[in-house]
Curated annotation (Swiss-Prot):
Residues engaged in binding Mg(2+): D13, G40
Name of this chain's protein: Adenylosuccinate synthetase
UniProt-listed GO biological process terms: 'de novo' AMP biosynthetic process; IMP metabolic process
Gene behind this protein: purA
Disulfide links within the chain: none
E.C. number(s) listed in UniProt: 6.3.4.4
Subcellular location(s) per record: Cytoplasm
Amino acid sequence: MTNVVVVGSQWGDEGKGKIVDWLSERADIVVRYQGGHNAGHTLVIDGTSYKLSLLPSGVVRPGKMAVIGNGVVVDPHALIAEIGRLEAQGVTVTPDNLRIADNATLILSLHRELDAMREDAASNSGTKIGTTRRGIGPAYEDKVGRRAIRVMDLADLDSLSGKVDRILTHHNALRRGLGVAEVSHQAIMDELTSVADRVLPFRDTVWLFLDKERRKGSRILFEGAQGTLLDIDHGTYPFVTSSNTVAGQAAAGSGMGPGSLGYILGITKAYTTRVGEGPFPTELKDAIGEFLGEKGHEFGVVTGRKRRCGWFDAALVRQSIATNGITGIALTKLDVLDGLEELKICVGYMLDGEQIDHLPASQGAQARVEPIYITLEGWKESTVGARSWADLPAQAIKYVRQVEELIGAPVALLSTSPERDDTILVTDPFED
């Protein structure tokens, strides 16, 4: 038995929600370790859809413990609203099935406002990143700047006032520079005191809780949000998120040691998508790109934004295999490729007349690369709902084998529809 870390191996939206839900049935604890409420996913259980963006997937399953780790930035209002939506669907959320790290950073209204002001200013100058305007980046900035308000601070109103003073010294200086009205001390105090009683019951010393559970032999599933190529260090900077999304963050963002992480499962879509700005070497701006977007329902859960679509990029996924230490992948949305006469896979790039096997880190070089493709024959038969290799067309199996060979990692799971049980299990990550 081992613990499992789930990471996205592309730009997010790889189908992590379904795979995490599939695995969470067998886990005891599901841990979120980075990001905020900027990356959503939909779980379908017994025909009911649950939309989550901050809460770990385990929260909708009876008998499971969901944990929000210290690496997550928590918007208390978004948290309360999400709990309310789940309770309206009959899901009970109490400290018996949800714990939040007492040292997790809080997202405040001033973070959301700063995020939006920056994006508006950047839109006018052509340097827009394409954030969700939810305050994620500014909250992480305050965390690194050592001025953040954390969950534990809600329990100590006597010292909270001084911490609010410190954060406002920074933010009001920024607001004056942007020509925006300053935020009052009382407004932030009111904002925090209004949510304290709803948030504090869930707080815990998460590293200690997880260590005790590990020693008891509990199965722990670490749930990543977004994807490797949005990692602040290893992604397509500056068009990235504000946290580390690679598997190593599961340790830092939860308080578990790296030796406890176990199997690293990379969720990998059978084609490529991206939301927002930034380089995308295999992007298809033609009828095939439209086909993938329509058939794959490529619209963001949180923002509703249309995703950009393109061919599978083996060179990028190879990089993700390396930077995460991925043990095996879960290949998702194979069924979206049904009916295409031919399929292409990017195996490398041409850059200024030279062939390279990885995407360079330089923004300028990323914009100049041209993908090198191999072409495979497609298949006409449907793969929707396949639950064994015998259910798959020969060409679909050939495509999967080609992907494995090109990325240098085996397929552990193969997903053939949004339904949880439409999954071909090759290797059980929990038993590896």
